[in-house]
Amino acid sequence: MSSEAESRLLADLAPIQALRKSSGDYSESGSHASFFLQAGQLVPAVRLLFEQGYFLEDIAGVDVAEGILIVYHFDRYDASGRVALRLTVPYAAKKAPSIAAIFSGADWHERECCDFFGVEFENHPDLKPLLLPDDLGIHPLLKDKDRKSLFSLLPLRQMVDGKT
């Protein structure tokens, strides 16, 4: 990433820089910036990315020891700047805010995450099952045992001091 592109990325994300956990080496992490957010921080951060011209690439879920890790990837066409927003949803709550009102493409991603992990997205316009039968009664990507901690999945330096 050129210094000009990095400067632009930093300027675009200035309002949420305090939340930033890593500035990435794209070749290692696949992202130029990574953020671990609380549920209340997600919608404002996503709205900022939308206003700065980012688009939603995907939403993925991972069952880890701390809960369901939801990873949101954003990018833009006019400059390098892939951003990852991460939100850990506790097993007890299994609720996350929906971003479908900001990025309509999130609709299907959130429905898929609900199907496979049981996460309910609050304020989602229509959280009916996307791929699985309505009456299945299980969430097939939840693990029964051997959940790994976030610390074992991500390099510790990426989670703590912002270096990748």
Identify what each model region corresponds to.
Residues M1-T164:
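Terminal low-complexity/charged segments
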